[in-house]
């Protein structure tokens, strides 16, 4: 739960929390004939200053050009939250069975997989958040 981790960092390491809300990190994904770039802080706040999105992916982080002090602040923050993300206390693990589906809020929850033996097929789909929120409001 990225929000639970962000709240812990906010309470126990307020300076690191501020850095993670302010310093933009670029991510890059290349595969399947596409290149996707995104640049945003790891912890993104809404206009009211409330946490809105947690974005963290050590594998797709791109080259960053930051001043030395900002780079050190960012690395301190990454080291802290990476340790928390990998702490079993903040994880829920579930082995999907054939035909099973899971729906999650990609702005709140981080997701991944552990090692497995054998072959598997996993299909993923993303719904645009604005479309989802709009539709939710229409059906409320």
Label for each model-derived stretch:
Residues 1-140:
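Active-site environment of non-heme Fe oxygenases that use a 2-His-1-carboxylate facial triad
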């Amino acid at each position: 739960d990225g929000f639970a981790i962000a709240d812990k960092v906010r309470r126990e390491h307020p300076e690191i929390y501020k850095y993670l809300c302010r310093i933009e990190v670029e991510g890059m994904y290349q595969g399947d004939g596409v290149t996707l770039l995104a640049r945003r802080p790891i912890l993104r706040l809404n206009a009211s200053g409330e946490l809105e999105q947690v974005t963290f992916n050590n594998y797709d982080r791109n080259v960053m050009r930051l001043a030395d002090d900002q780079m050190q602040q960012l690395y301190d923050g990454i080291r802290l939250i990476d340790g928390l993300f990998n702490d079993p206390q903040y994880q829920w693990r579930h082995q999907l069975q054939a035909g099973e589906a899971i729906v999650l809020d990609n702005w709140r929850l981080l997701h991944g997989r552990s090692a497995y033996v054998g072959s598997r097929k996993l299909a993923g789909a993303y719904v645009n958040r604005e479309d989802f929120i709009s539709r939710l409001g229409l059906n409320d």
